[in-house]
Amino acid sequence: MKKILAMALALLFVAALFTGCSKKAESPSEPNANDVASDTTEEVKEKTSADNTDADSQTVKIGFAIKSTGSSFYQALATGVQNACEERGWECTVLNADMDITKEQENVETLIGQQVDAPIDASAEVITTVYNNNTTTAFMVGKYIPQFFADDELISSVVLSGGKGNTGGTERRQGMVAGIIAERMGLSEEEAWSEAAKFDEDLIANGHAFHEGANLEIRGQAYCNWLASDGLDGMEDLLVANPDINCLLSENDDMALGAQKAITAAGKDNQIQVFCAADGSKEGYLQLRDNPQWRVIGENSPPKVGALAVEIAGQVVLEGKTANDFDAVVMTEANIVTSDTVNDFYDPDSPF
């Protein structure tokens, strides 16, 4: 029986469905990084045996049954898997299901029939789940925000969310709020997350929320399916209702890219600062580099997630590791990208 490794991207995407960047579908819940044990990228590398150099020279066949390659995000994910295999001299087959669950199951069966050593599937019994360090990254983004406002200035924001009830989106939204609260009030991370959870309950229940201690308000929320086009529509509506805001919090940069068009059209480029919990697309990094009102983006790199999944697959195939050797979730390193560091992350040749 072949070992199957499930791979998931935090925020949007977990075992059942990759939806965030190309389909207008409600994203399913994903594992909550606060509720499961996790390895970091470095810990996984430390667990790799000293014989790995010899192991990498062996021929391994990796198969990736991907939900879709219909967007640059998915393309970059597949490319990350392919490049990681190529670096090791391994064979790699990517089969695209075009968002068809039946076809995806058929693709997995095809890969097993082709005797690949490790089929990577997004909806299988898992060795482990690999994704971006969602909560830590969003919290880091939030802590970075207050420096751009005077100590006694009200941070008056709206928020763009991907999908109702999406666990990853909730983690990102609450993470940014928790970071702001922690930085402005000097609270511990645990205390700030507790405050952020209560704040988020008010936001979901009432459509707006205010935190007196942090002098932070979110005056409106729009669900924009992780898409720039919906971010444009959502921001247009939010600006009509809330013309005096000075801040935009977005759960990903694609929605913020659409929102930026609405901000510019409304003549509010110099009024509203933009902060994104993720993802780090090429277009987002260009805004961060060239637009002084874009301040920070949390990194959610599909190539890095793909590469880490291949690394773990190699440990399973070549070293005989099992689910018992990994935590339930293995996460990539948490990074935030700012205007000072964006050139270290921006890749003009990136497919994403």
Where would I find each of the regions flagged by the language model?
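Positively charged n-region of N-terminal signal peptides that target proteins for export
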Residues: M1-L11
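A residue-level marker of the well-folded mature domains of exported/periplasmic proteins
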Residues: C21-F352
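C-terminal motif of bacterial Sec signal peptides marking the signal peptidase cleavage site
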Residues: A16-G20
